[in-house]
C-alpha cells in the first residue's frame, strides 16, 4: 500500500532510532513493530532520499520486496520529512526447519574471496545477515538466511554479493524457481 504521512521528521544524526521510534508508535504504519531500520539498504545521498525498514522474523530482517517499508523523504535543513511510504508485509510466517548453526560472516567473506568475488585492493563496506527468498512453492515463499556483503572495488564501484548462510554457497541466481502441483 502507498500512504501519505504527516508530521514525521527523521534526524539524520540519529536515523536508526528516529525510524525505529516512528515505526513503533501506534497508528503510524500498519504492523510497525514488525519492522526494523536498514541503514545499508537506505539512500540519503540521492536526489530522492529514501529510508528502508525491513520486516523481521525471530530477530532477523527480510531483504525482499514482499516485506519492507520504503520511506520517501524530503530534506529540510538538518532533518528529513517523510513525504510518503510504500509498505509490503508478510503474514502467516511458518518456520520450516529447526534452528541450525549458521555460517559466520567470516565464512561468507572467505567464500567470496576464494571464488574471486573480492579482488585485490577491494574494501568491505558492510555485512548484513537477512532472509532472502530462494524458492516459491505453491504460492508460498521459502526464505533462507543470506549474508549480504558490500564490496568497494579498486575502481570505486560497489557490488553487493550474497552468500547462503546455511550452505556457505554464493547466491548467483536472481530468478526464484517456482514449484507447482501438476
Question: What residues fall within each predicted segment?
Answer:
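Extracytoplasmic/luminal low-complexity segments enriched in Pro/Gly and acidic/polar residues
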Residues: 78-182
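Generic detector of bulky aromatic hydrophobic side chains
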Residues: 35-36, 74-77, 179
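Structured segments of extracytoplasmic/periplasmic soluble domains
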Residues: 21-29, 72-74, 111, 115, ...
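Aromatic/basic-lined ligand-recognition segments
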Residues: 43-75, 122-140, 144-147
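Preferential activation on post-signal-peptide N-terminal prodomains/segments
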Residues: 1-43, 48-59
Amino acid at each position: 500500500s502507498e500512504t501519505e504521512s504527516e508530521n514525521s521528521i527523521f534526524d539524520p544524526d540519529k536515523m536508526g532510532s528516529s525510524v525505529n521510534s516512528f515505526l513503533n508508535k501506534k497508528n503510524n504504519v500498519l504492523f510497525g513493530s514488525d519492522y526494523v531500520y536498514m541503514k545499508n539498504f537506505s539512500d540519503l545521498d540521492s536526489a530522492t532520499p529514501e529510508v528502508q525498514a525491513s520486516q523481521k522474523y525471530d530477530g532477523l530482517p527480510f531483504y525482499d520486496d514482499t516485506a519492507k517499508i520504503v520511506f520517501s523523504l524530503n530534506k529540510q535543513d538538518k532533518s528529513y520529512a517523510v513525504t510518503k511510504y510504500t509498505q509490503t508485509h508478510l503474514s502467516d510466517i511458518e518456520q520450516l526447519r529447526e534452528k541450525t548453526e549458521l555460517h559466520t560472516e567470516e565464512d561468507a567473506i572467505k567464500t567470496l574471496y576464494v571464488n574471486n568475488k573480492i579482488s585485490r585492493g577491494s574494501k568491505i563496506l558492510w555485512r548484513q545477515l537477512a532472509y532472502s527468498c530462494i524458492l516459491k512453492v505453491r504460492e508460498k515463499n521459502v526464505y533462507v538466511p543470506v549474508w549480504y556483503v558490500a564490496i568497494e572495488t579498486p575502481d570505486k564501484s560497489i557490488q553487493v554479493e550474497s552468500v547462503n548462510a546455511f550452505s556457505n554457497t554464493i547466491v548467483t541466481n536472481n530468478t526464484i524457481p517456482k514449484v507447482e502441483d501438476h
